[in-house]
Amino acid sequence: MAEADAAVAKAEAANAQADLSSSEALIAHLKLEIAKLRREIYGTRSERKARLLEQMELRLEDLEAAATEDELVAEKAAARTQTIQSFQRKRPSRKPFPDHLLRERIVIAAPESCPCCGSAKLSKLGEDITETLEVIPRQWKVIQTVREKFSCRECEKIMQPPAPFHVTPRGFAGPNLLAMILFEKFGQHQPLNRQSERYRREGIDLSVSTLADQVGACTTALRPLHALIERHVLAAERLHGDDTTVPILAKGKTVTGRIWTYVRDDRPFGGHAPPAALYYASRDRKHEHPVQHLQAFTGILQADAYSGYNELYDPSRSQGAITAALCWAHARRQFFELADIAANARRGKNAAAISPVALAAVKRIDALFDIERDINGLSTEERLRVRQEQSAPLLAALEAWLREEHSRLSRSASVAQPIDYMLRRWDRFARFIEDGRVCLTNNAAERALRGFALGRKSWLFAGSERGADRAAAMTTLIMTAKLNDVDPQAWLADVLARIANIPQSRLPELLPWHWAAEMEHRKVAA
């Protein structure tokens, strides 16, 4: 009797724990969905929200795993009793498996006789189908292209078709394999040594030097497309520019190099030109690099306040001065850090006082962002009209308020620095009031550099300056494909298979936006 009571108590406790874990997981799931929906509807107002979403997703993973563990414990405990029913967890509904997935039908053999009376007179009433998602391990194959030799009995001439084309000299790899190697290295940030190890576990011995040989040859083969994308980007009316660090090995030591990006995206002001991202690498951050990169560009450059761009804004520039526009998200971030109540609370004893001025500045800047969300994607003229009517009064009030607060504050006040940063560059911050093409933020360029931030964690450094150049060139291709909603690996595979045989005049057909249209046309025709 005591054992039965103990089993019941244990089962009840297990059910309670499973119920609690399930509730926590469900709450976390719903909070995450709400946060994602708010982000889609209202846009991203701060980097902190992006980080918060990542933290919520990680927390949800742990809670889901814990809830499943507790549910299984409750099932086992309930099975040892006759009075306790096992806890049944309420899970968020799962999406059905996509229709395009291959279905393998396995029919369980029908019974030959009735298990109740033994009769063989059975008739089928219907069927129930249980679907199980499974993965097929990657398949490798060797394609043997047979070239038969023939001789002419009249003139004894020997004939044989030419050898099949390979993308790379001394080539042995097909375009799909090459595309996978390139995308995993430059799109998924998997170094060649890790790829080589994984292939070896799958029974394929491809050394790092062999893979590197293929990568170098593919980069050379794809250079013409990189040149076309470069020309397309630099022909833009407005560019987003930014840079980030990348460690580069150089003669036994590591130097802090830079990756520069210039993003063309006309969609916010209703432009129809395809978006594209251009990358360059350098061993330092000297001003000569952006000057060289943008020597053929004339238009608007949205960037940070890096002094290396100043030569581009010089009215005496031979190609014509580039118009500077600064990023409001960058300015807002400086105020937000002084007004972040949650972050301040986490500092505990080291917390600094929340700045009321910074908090007020964030609210005033957010009012401008609210207007921008409503005009995103409208024409240049319509955006300018709304800004003149709605944003201009707010901007004038913000400038007057900042100047008044700046005159009151001590130079040592923490909030004085971001105010001074804005006021000394006010004409560049106010550029969006004069031109509907200007965006309020430089987020397009910052997003384009996130891959390199992730890459630094994976591959730590670029192996050489040429390696950094190669990474910049390949990332140009991959990111441009992504910006046009094109699968980079599928695109690279098709391009590598065709690029050697296509005339120079038709190379633009292989650009991601033209390629996507061609694939869609083929799909419709089929």
Features from the language model and the residues they span:
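Catalytic center-proximal scaffold of phosphoryl-transfer enzymes
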Residues: 28, 50, 64, 69, ...
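Short, flexible loop/hinge motifs at secondary-structure junctions
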Residues: 1-169, 240-241, 269-273, 303
